[in-house]
Amino acid sequence: MTEQTSEATVVNNSPAPTIPKIKREKPTPEEIEERRKLKQLEVVPEGFSRKQWKRELKKQRWQDTKQEYLEVQREKKRLARQRKRERLKDLDENDELRKAQPIPSRQISTNNVSVIIDCDFDELMHEKEIVSLSNQIKACYSAMRHCTYKLPIQITSFNKRLKQRFEAQLHDYHLWQGNISFTDRSLTEYVTGAPNSESKDNDGNSNSNTTNSTDTINTENLVYLTADTDEEITKLEPNHTYIIGGIVDKNRHKQLCYNKAKELGIKVARLPIGKYIEMNGRHVLVTSHVYELLCKWFENDGDWETAFNKVLPPRKIKSKSPS
């Protein structure tokens, strides 16, 4: 019996595979000084400031090393999967470690609540802000995959630099699964019924889950979320679509989304941030946080405070009881 017990508790102690680190020698003070002198002598092309040229060189270096970086990241992920398989292969199916890794439910909200990300602000953003917005949309997709309640997303005004960014750097968005779609039509065109090219899903096909070129949206069921209003939402209404402004501008453009909503006859409202958390400055959240908060509201049975604390980084919030 003793021998059998010892055999049953054998654990694979073989060392985990690792990626050899590339050792780079630190430059000497003389080399650093030489580099500094070369930078001072460097000729900045016409039309560039020194700062802009430095940024351009950095972008070129990234393009030169991008493939190597991606290969290292893929290898890290492969090794992580391998380590996970080794940890789990000798464990029983009822082991606590397996129980601690549930697969998220594929349930979609039955209340017909959906989300539009209005990206019709391309000309108001700098290049870095376009990159940031594209990453936030990617974060929305990640939240959709992992949340229990997956609110459908439609990205409107998917064109210009934003689309170019996706096609160049995030081209696998065509393979995204779930109820997320992209259209070059603007929110204004949907509301007014102005014709444009047909909405496409991530496979480039006509998307039956979104309005086509002749459809309009009933503004009675639209709510534009903006911090520039005193009207707060207390719950997410069934059969309503909540619009998130797809813009990264460091608050340069005040009341931008508010004014657009008023022009289109769309109701405006803000999330009840002040009732549950305290934030420094204006109560403005990034696009991906707003989307995830809406999903978490359903997941936590309408508990805004729990949703805020689950989504926002602890360093940015301070719990506050409802008044």
Curated annotation (Swiss-Prot):
Residues 99-319 form the SAM-dependent MTase TRM10-type domain. It comes from the Eukaryota. Its EC number is 2.1.1.221. InterPro entries: MT_TRM10-typ, MT_TRM10-typ_sf, TRM10/TRM10A, tRNA_m1G_MeTrfase_euk, tRNA_MeTrfase_TRMD/TRM10. GO terms for biological process: tRNA N1-guanine methylation. Residues 204-215 have a biased composition (Low complexity). GO terms for molecular function: tRNA (guanosine(9)-N1)-methyltransferase activity; tRNA binding. Residues 1-16 have a biased composition (Polar residues). Belongs to the class IV-like SAM-binding methyltransferase superfamily. TRM10 family. S-adenosyl-L-methionine-dependent guanine N(1)-methyltransferase that catalyzes the formation of N(1)-methylguanine at position 9 (m1G9) in cytoplasmic tRNA. Monomer. This is tRNA (guanine(9)-N1)-methyltransferase. It comes from Candida albicans (strain SC5314 / ATCC MYA-2876) (Yeast). The gene is TRM10.
